[in-house]
């Protein structure tokens, strides 16, 4: 299973959509800013092995989709842009799903306990916590939008890294 250029194009389009969703000046929301502990070094360094990189990428995209595909999110954003973003994230997940069974196979049940996956889940828990603490305010969503741009940039970096690893997710 090979990662396609389509996956990278979808990723870039999703980043553009997030940028267009900007409704407030991020500077007006600095008081709500929080370090969510984006595990960037995990992606950019050599901490992830090839067999871990795919599940981490999948988890980041799935969690991103889940975050924006909610009732609270629908109330916060322009519906058209939000739908386009969710569609783009779903397209990325669908593409990865074609590889998922081949790559993960029987190990799938163990991946939920894999340290990098747990790190990604904790990262998104922090994002949900901020939204709840701030009552899903416009500023909270703006902080989340900016943070998700960082997260999707990291996901894109991980996709590039997987491609450099050969793109064939079945090879050792």
Curated annotation (Swiss-Prot):
Any further remark recorded for this protein: IFN-tau genes are intronless. They evolved from IFN-omega genes in the ruminantia suborder and have continued to duplicate independently in different lineages of the ruminantia. They code for proteins very similar in sequence but with different biological potency and pattern of expression.
Transmembrane domains' residue ranges: none
Gene3D superfamilies per UniProt: 1.20.1250.10
UniProt tissue specificity: Constitutively and exclusively expressed in the mononuclear cells of the extraembryonic trophectoderm.
Example GO BP: female pregnancy
Compartment annotation: Secreted
GO molecular function annotations of the record: cytokine activity; cytokine receptor binding; hormone activity
Annotated keywords: Antiviral defense, Cytokine, Disulfide bond, Hormone, Pregnancy, Secreted
Species name: Ovis aries (Sheep)
Name of the protein described by the UniProt record: Interferon tau-3
PROSITE patterns, A to Z: INTERFERON_A_B_D
Keyword Disulfide bond: yes
Main location: secreted
Source organism superkingdom: Eukaryota
Described function: Paracrine hormone primarily responsible for maternal recognition of pregnancy. Interacts with endometrial receptors, probably type I interferon receptors, and blocks estrogen receptor expression, preventing the estrogen-induced increase in oxytocin receptor expression in the endometrium. This results in the suppression of the pulsatile endometrial release of the luteolytic hormone prostaglandin F2-alpha, hindering the regression of the corpus luteum (luteolysis) and therefore a return to ovarian cyclicity.
């Amino acid at each position: 299973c090979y990662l396609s250029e389509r996956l990278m194009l979808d990723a870039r389009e999703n980043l553009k959509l997030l940028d267009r969703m900007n409704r407030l000046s991020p500077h007006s929301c600095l008081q709500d800013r929080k370090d969510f502990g984006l595990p960037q070094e995990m992606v950019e360094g050599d901490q992830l092995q090839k067999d871990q990189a795919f599940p981490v990428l999948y988890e980041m995209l799935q969690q991103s989709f889940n975050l924006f595909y909610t009732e609270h999110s629908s109330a916060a954003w322009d519906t058209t842009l939000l739908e386009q973003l969710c569609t783009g994230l779903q397209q990325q997940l669908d593409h990865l799903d074609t590889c998922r069974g081949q790559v993960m196979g029987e190990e799938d049940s163990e991946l939920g306990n894999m340290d990098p996956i747990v790190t990604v889940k904790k990262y998104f828990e922090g994002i949900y916590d901020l939204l709840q603490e701030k009552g899903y305010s416009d500023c909270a969503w703006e902080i989340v939008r900016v943070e998700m741009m960082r997260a999707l940039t990291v996901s894109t970096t991980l996709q590039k890294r997987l491609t450099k690893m050969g793109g064939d997710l079945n090879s050792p």
